[in-house]
UniProtKB/Swiss-Prot annotation:
<comment type="function">
    <text>Involved in the heme biosynthesis. Catalyzes the aerobic oxidative decarboxylation of propionate groups of rings A and B of coproporphyrinogen-III to yield the vinyl groups in protoporphyrinogen-IX.</text>
</comment>
<feature type="binding site">
    <location>
        <position position="145"/>
    </location>
    <ligand>
        <name>a divalent metal cation</name>
    </ligand>
</feature>
<feature type="binding site">
    <location>
        <position position="175"/>
    </location>
    <ligand>
        <name>a divalent metal cation</name>
    </ligand>
</feature>
<dbReference type="GO" id="GO:0006782">
    <property type="term" value="P:protoporphyrinogen IX biosynthetic process"/>
</dbReference>
<comment type="pathway">
    <text>Porphyrin-containing compound metabolism; protoporphyrin-IX biosynthesis; protoporphyrinogen-IX from coproporphyrinogen-III (O2 route): step 1/1.</text>
</comment>
<dbReference type="InterPro" id="IPR018375">
    <property type="entry name" value="Coprogen_oxidase_CS"/>
</dbReference>
<dbReference type="InterPro" id="IPR001260">
    <property type="entry name" value="Coprogen_oxidase_aer"/>
</dbReference>
<feature type="binding site">
    <location>
        <begin position="108"/>
        <end position="110"/>
    </location>
    <ligand>
        <name>substrate</name>
    </ligand>
</feature>
<dbReference type="InterPro" id="IPR036406">
    <property type="entry name" value="Coprogen_oxidase_aer_sf"/>
</dbReference>
<keyword id="KW-0963">Cytoplasm</keyword>
<feature type="binding site">
    <location>
        <position position="96"/>
    </location>
    <ligand>
        <name>a divalent metal cation</name>
    </ligand>
</feature>
<keyword id="KW-0479">Metal-binding</keyword>
<dbReference type="GO" id="GO:0046872">
    <property type="term" value="F:metal ion binding"/>
</dbReference>
<keyword id="KW-0350">Heme biosynthesis</keyword>
<dbReference type="GO" id="GO:0005737">
    <property type="term" value="C:cytoplasm"/>
</dbReference>
<dbReference type="Pfam" id="PF01218">
    <property type="entry name" value="Coprogen_oxidas"/>
</dbReference>
<feature type="active site" description="Proton donor">
    <location>
        <position position="106"/>
    </location>
</feature>
Length: 299
């Protein structure tokens, strides 16, 4: 069936509402909404919760942009898209908790369609979610990956292992030779077997994010932390910034398409520190993280 961009847009708007409601219920603070328009076509609504009881910053962004020609970042690996008009829409979010024992989480679901008269539309879905812990809790990693595996199961036995591997490969800091976190799911260019099946899978991933993340938040939010844990959290947040500014395709796409810079960089942690050649104390919980984030089968 023909791709229905309007149906996707309605789902994405309701997903943003749903995720914001669930995060606000856990935190107690409210999101502030900022609606924006893009001069070249489209717009979005950015929602940010700041300095809450649980989340130092949570940003949940919906955007829908369209234009007459594709940006260089998109046509580089898809030359057949040159000369087509395009629509790109998605929900993207990053949650930076205050408590260092709660991991940072990221999720994104998106839809893209490029058209030109007299030709079949080129379309695909993409998305996923991934987790960036500061302290190693095996049960959290297992729960996160079990949720990911279970939502993939109806779509085939090979779906979870394939998208887990893609996530591990994508969220990798080449210049540090380390993973960004413990991964999750990542998929892109999804357009088979048909529009409806792909759309259903994207919906499952979008809805699965809170099922994966919120039980971990509940488990960790009352844990007592101090200056040492905070110092380590801010240091490790530096890796998050490095990945987003150096390697992330979505950031590059947004900036190249004249997206709204404030919304694109909403994923940045509010506070972060770099320290020259810092090393954790041997045998410490901080030292355990480097082993913990290495790629492995969690379920």
């Amino acid at each position: 069936m023909k791709p229905d961009a309007q149906r996707v847009k309605q789902f994405l708007l309701s997903l943003q509402d749903d995720i914001c409601q669930q995060l606000a219920a856990v935190d107690g603070a409210d999101f502030v909404e900022d609606s924006w328009q893009r001069d070249a076509g489209g717009g979005g609504r950015s929602r940010v919760l700041r300095n809450g009881g649980v989340f130092e910053q949570a940003g949940v962004n919906f955007s829908h942009v369209h234009g007459d020609a594709m940006p260089a970042s998109a046509t580089a690996h898809r030359p057949e898209l040159a000369g087509r008009s395009f629509e790109a829409m998605g929900v993207s979010l990053v949650v930076h908790p205050l408590n260092p024992y709660i991991p940072t989480s990221h999720a994104n679901v998106r839809f893209f369609i490029a058209e030109k008269p007299g030709a079949e539309p080129v379309w695909w879905f993409g998305g996923g979610f991934d987790l960036t812990p500061y302290y190693a809790f095996e049960e959290d990693a297992i729960h996160w990956h079990r949720t990911a595996r279970d939502l993939c199961q109806p779509y085939g036995e090979d779906v979870y292992p394939r998208y887990k591997k893609w996530c591990d490969d994508y969220f990798f800091l080449k210049h540090r030779d380390e993973q960004r976190g413990i991964g999750g799911l990542f998929f892109d260019d999804l357009n088979t077997p048909d529009f409806d099946s792909c759309f259903r899978f994207m919906q499952a991933v979008g809805k699965g994010y809170t099922d994966a993340f919120l039980p971990i938040v509940e488990r960790r939010k009352a844990m007592v932390w101090g200056e040492r844990e905070r110092h380590f959290q801010l240091y490790r947040r530096g890796r998050y910034v490095e990945f987003n500014l150096v390697w992330d395709r979505g950031t590059l796409f947004g900036l190249q398409t004249g997206g709204r810079t404030e919304s694109i960089l909403m994923s940045m942690p509010p506070l972060v520190r770099w320290e020259y050649d810092w090393q954790p104390e041997e045998g410490s919980p901080e030292a355990a993280l480097s082993e913990f984030i290495k790629v492995r089968d969690w379920v």
